[in-house]
A protein has these predicted regions:
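Acidic/polar low-complexity segments and flexible, solvent-exposed patches
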Residues: 2-132
Length: 132
């Protein structure tokens, strides 16, 4: 085994370990909160067109609220679910609602909204396939 292969193996091992750890930690908190958020959303926005947005991408401290930051501050690159409610009205005005704590409205650029919508549609299609 040459030097290059050894480094590659170590890199892969470390990457897998981190992913395994992150999945365990995130799933424990975020999954439970995500389903709770969905239940609350059903109650709160019965008469509105509400969309649940699920995102699987690296942890972004600048996007999240203080509550989320304290929860995940030990690991800056957590992969997991982050639940956000996007109503049609909030999309129109370029803001969104965070579910875990009542963070109020936060501004979003149009590009960010487009990206979120793309993820939302993709996730929704995946969920629909699972339901069938």
């Amino acid at each position: 085994m040459n030097k290059q292969n050894i480094f590659q193996t170590i890199k892969e091992w470390w990457h897998n370990l981190r992913r395994h750890w992150a999945r365990r930690v995130v799933t424990r908190y975020a999954k439970r909160e995500f389903y709770a958020a969905m239940r609350r959303a059903d109650e709160r926005y019965k008469h509105e067109h509400t969309m649940i947005y699920v995102c699987s991408k690296p942890f972004q401290p600048d996007v999240l609220t203080t509550y989320d930051r304290t929860r995940f501050k030990r690991e800056k690159q957590v992969w997991g679910w982050h639940a956000t409610l996007l109503t049609l009205q909030s999309l129109k005005f370029g803001c969104y609602y965070h579910t875990p704590d009542k963070a109020g409205n936060q501004r979003m650029k149009q590009k960010e909204i487009d990206v979120r919508l793309k993820y939302f549609i993709k996730e929704r299609l995946a969920l629909a396939k699972l339901a069938d």
